Amino acid sequence: AAPKPGQVFVVGCSTSEVIGSLIGTAGSMEAAQSIFAALLKVTSKHGLYLAVQCCEHLNRSLVTEAEAAEKYCWEEVAVKPVAHAGGSLAQVAYNSFRQAIVVEKISAHLGLDIGQTLIGMHLRRVVVPVRLSQKEIGAAVLTAARTRPPYVGGERAVY
């Protein structure tokens, strides 16, 4: 199903993996800026809210626009992501969004994982894999997902 305007797109990205290093070892601000620009272009085109996952040092908190947090009732946390505590893409997002804030948890409708950063904790309950024609960005493996409402009921239920 096509994304709907107002939905949330979560992205986790290891720029270390993108440039061919192990996750968390060699972040790249240059790669982060290029990736963020591409993500912003796509999310703007489709009217989606972008949420960028920080690294495990910030408990995988997320950088997003204050407007998204207000709409979805996400609670803000007090932290400023930087390259070595949050990740390069999170730092770029924080410095680039109109009104950037950091939140601890969300339930996104769609997701893209660049470099196996493990975004599953921020997706809605029923996750459906999306097969992409492009399997990598640089040296980083791409994994994409969408979500759907859970099916409830038993043998009498109609969907």
Segment roles from a protein language model:
Residues 91, 95-159:
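Glycine-rich, aromatic-bearing surface loops/beta-hairpins
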Residues 18-20:
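Short, solvent-exposed loop/turn segments at secondary-structure junctions
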Residues 23-29:
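Short glycine-enriched, charge-decorated loop/helix-capping segments at active-site entrances
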Residues 2-3, 85, 131-136:
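Solvent-exposed alpha-helices and their adjacent loops that cap or buttress functional pockets
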Residues 46-115:
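Ligand-binding beta-strand-loop-alpha-helix segment within the catalytic cores
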Residues 1-9, 30-42:
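N-terminal glycine-/serine-/threonine-rich phosphate-binding loop
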Residues 9-12, 143:
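Structural motif
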Residues 11-16, 53:
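Glycine-rich beta-strand-to-loop/alpha-helix junction loops that act as flexible
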